[in-house]
Amino acid sequence: KSKISKELEVFYNPIMKLNRDTSILLLNLIKDKEMQLALPLAGSGIRGIRFLKELKKNKIKNISFNDYGSIKHIKQNIKLNELEKDSKLKLSSKDANLFLLESKGFDYIDIDPFGSPNQFLDNAIIRISRNGILAVTATDTSALSGSHESACIRKYYAKPLRNELMHEVGIRILIRKVQLIGA
């Protein structure tokens, strides 16, 4: 089990455990591929720590933890989990877009910002490898679920629904935005 410091100044959302669980399941299902993984907005580092501890040993070629403001906390959590000597680890403290632009590319990129992922999509798509996986999380659910219709239209070029289908439609709007940027 992964450990995380209780004295974090960075955002850690325990409710997103299912999201992290799904990432691990997905990556473990990929056959015979040693992957380069990137976490441009690593936050507390918990997702990457779980990757190192829970993915099959031959899955990770290297894993890049990046976060402009919390690399100190990522290092603390890596040490807490006794992973500081892992040669697959790469740490950096750059703006997420700069981190992506300066890289050579990755097989898996996880974009998990606070709010909309839009400002990171262009560079993530540029740096994802052929047949790579781009994981995108959006926490601006008020826009995507229709509470703030004008924000959704402005950010995602789509009109959300405010009914029993709002969450399904919100996911579809986000997927379509990623498709538009990647096209």
Go through each PLM region and give its residues.
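SAM-dependent transferase fold signal centered on methyltransferase-like domains
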Residues: 1-183
